[in-house]
Amino acid sequence: MKVIGVTGGVGAGKSEVLAHLAGKYNCRVIMADRLAHQLEEPGGACYEPLVALLGKDVLDGNGGIDRQKMAAAIFTDEILLQKVNAIVHPAVKQALLAEIAQEKAAGERDWLFIEAALLVEEGYAGILDELWYVHAEEGVRRQRLRESRGYTEEKIDAILQNQLSEKAFFEHCDVVIENNAGLERVYKQIEKELGENQWQKQRNFRDS
């Protein structure tokens, strides 16, 4: 089984790439953000440390962490943000290592895709066989964010300023998936990297 990281800037189209992979190939897709959310729930590895750091004011009526309240608490406090990241990021990485080990032991899938915005910054190269960068020009990304999410230019500017530069992404990635000109071209690039529809091929074999 090959472990492939998928990263890229906001609006690049990672979700479409991952949906295609999950539907067409014998693989599993893990979203690091969703894994982090699970770890932040009551009973998760990050819950108690985060509550101890941020206080009970960030809890909702059911005792869970209200993500909007947490975001508001760290939005203008860089030091607090770093402390939150120091709790969450190592826990996510450990959880991912456990998932990788489990999938390799099962031996049922050909690929495991891990999506995370900070794969480069957090030093995930050591646990990945390849790193894919989903790339779209900034103008294309801005248009997508305005149209699909209703973001203002000011909000887009703030997000882009906090993301890794294109140069850094290009320097660290093994494969670039260009997503400037429609999904059919994206799918052809993926097929070039992975081959034909492996999931369909295996399913047809089992059904015969």
Label each region the model flagged.
Residues L96, A125-I127, E147, Y151-E196, ...:
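Small-molecule kinase domains that catalyze NTP-dependent phosphoryl transfer to phosphate-bearing small molecules
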Residues V6:
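Hydrophobic anchor at the beta1->P-loop junction of P-loop NTPases
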Residues L97-A105, W111-E147:
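ATP-dependent NMP and nucleoside kinases share a basic, alpha-helical "lid"
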Residues H37-D110:
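ATP-dependent small-molecule kinase phosphotransfer cores
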Residues V10:
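The conserved Walker
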Residues C27-E40:
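Short beta-strand-centered segment that lines the nucleotide-binding/catalytic pocket of NTP-utilizing
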Residues S15:
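Walker A/P-loop
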